[in-house]
Amino acid sequence: MQLADLSNLAAKLDGVTERRRDGLLDWRYRGRRVARQLDGSHIVIRSSFDSRDFLVRSFPETFSVPRRFAKHMMIVADLENGNAEAIEDAVIGAWELQSGK
């Protein structure tokens, strides 16, 4: 999965805006973070704790929770080596979480 794929997905999610902050992409729903770019191959995605645990167990090659995100409702996705469908589903889940859909 590429960052351009995420931009295309975000454009299809009602109310999600994309912008750059310090050169990195950031996607928000009414000001609430859905996901943001960490570097060229990783993004962090908003996620409930239950969903985060499920994703890490189900797709360990795709998702991780570094220590700095352990107390936060966030999960890191590996765009280069991860499962593109799982990442897409996680981003849609983040939008649903933030939008209440």
Regions found by a protein language model. Give the residues of each.
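Charge-dense, helix-prone N-terminal extensions
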Residues: M1-K101
